Amino acid sequence: MDFKNANELLTLCEEKNLPVSEVMRIREIELGETSAEIVNEKMTRVLEIMKDAAFSPIKQPVKSMGGLIGGEARKLSLHAQEKKGLCGDLLQKAITYAMATLETNASMGLIVASPTAGSAGIVPGLMLAMQEHYHFSDEKIIQALFNASAIGYLAMRNATVAGAVGGCQAEVGVASAMAASAAVELMGGSPKECTFAASTVLMNMLGLVYDPVGGLVEYPCQNRNAAGVANAIIAAEMALAGIPQLIPLDEMIQTMFTVGKKLPAELRETAMGGCATTPSACEACHMCS
């Protein structure tokens, strides 16, 4: 069982009467010539790593290697405990876990690139927040991760997830699309609604540049992971409400790729434009001088 694009994925889902997650899981088993047990064990390990990367910085903040971030997730957690937050429980936890994961990455901790290190907080941020908020089992979250991986696979096969090629839209944008699709399936949405959510996300983040201060995956990457997880919730909610997406996911992936290639090199991970060249950023980071 294999698919090259979202249209083929939806056809398989309809023909086999399966959710996106199960089509992707079977694909991994068949193409990897392995067993269901091994594939499930690997995804179980993925979830374990995600949990540790998201929870550890909240308990014990660590400064990043570049010194630009560290402790933000704990501040968000404490703020939530004071009951003064603007966000509801789900979004508050999601942005906290997303930012925490970036702290783990920036301090040389173990993370799951989903699909990249710079966007690694979005999928676990939303999945772990939904698990706590809705009391989903690990098995349900693991299944949702297979759904997310299907969207990531489509972006990698037909476009890019590299910021150096497509800008931050290809990293944070794709990660947000993965999370949105997984969230839709978790809440009982259809395969088509999953692709609607993913397409909406990419549309909302189209053209986002990659401008890491000092060339480090710290700032503004951490903030954008928080924005990405919020974007995923918005897109998933719209899809679940029955709002269709005019532009299919396959077309949106191609559009993202086209726009990314048109971005100047200064805005594609070179730290030569955008936030990276502001006076305040350069003053804060000795690597900019």
Where are these regions (language model features)?
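Glycine- and acidic-residue-rich phosphate-binding/metal-coordinating active-site segment common to enzymes
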Residues: 145, 151-164, 168-178, 183
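Functionally critical mobile loop/hinge segments
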Residues: 183-289
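Alpha-helix capping and helix-loop boundary segments enriched in small/acidic/polar residues
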Residues: 85, 114-117, 139, 163-171, ...
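Acidic-glycine-rich active-site phosphate/pyrophosphate-binding loop
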Residues: 88-105, 140-159, 203-212, 271
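Conserved phosphate/anionic-ligand binding catalytic regions in large, soluble enzymes, centered on
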Residues: 108-126, 170-175
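Alpha-helical support elements that line or immediately flank enzyme active sites
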Residues: 124-135, 180-188
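Glycine- and small hydrophobic-enriched segments that form the cores of compact globular domains
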Residues: 86, 113-120, 132, 136, ...
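Generic N-terminal targeting/processing segments that precede catalytic cores or assembly contacts
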Residues: 1-109, 133, 242, 249-289
